[in-house]
Amino acid sequence: MIPRTGILLVALLLLACQQPPTRETLNSQLPERPYSGVVRAGHTYYFAGRVSVSDSTRALTEGRTAAEVRNIMESYRTLFDDLGLEFSDVVQGNVFLADVNDYAEMNAVYAEYFATDPPARTTVAVAALPGGANVEIAFIAVRAAR
């Protein structure tokens, strides 16, 4: 019984002595905003929410939400490529919709990027989003060993 207790105590001591993950701000091109675009802590990446409103999407009456979701996801693809990540590294998604009636339209495009083994996700309907956007999406990703 004592050897097991000793091993457990040594394991707990080693865990307590580990260095916490280093926090690093990445892709911080938002000097006018009080938040970071991406924060990395160890192998975990926390992405601020992204919206995609442009004159072309604002002019859409049908398919606007789908166009915004596709633009957001493609901007994530570019960012992930820069950081050496893939959509398969995403473990949590948070989606904010200005109109809950756009859920099916958003979901159809979102599913294209997570065809197999999708991450956990929360979807929330909100009163409004910055810039008149219909959709905002934020992710948490963990870099997988490759």
PLM features: what roles do these ranges have?
Residues 1-2:
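N-terminal secretory signal peptides that target proteins for export/translocation
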Residues 5-74, 78-91, 97-146:
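N-terminal presequence-like segments and the immediate start of the first folded domain
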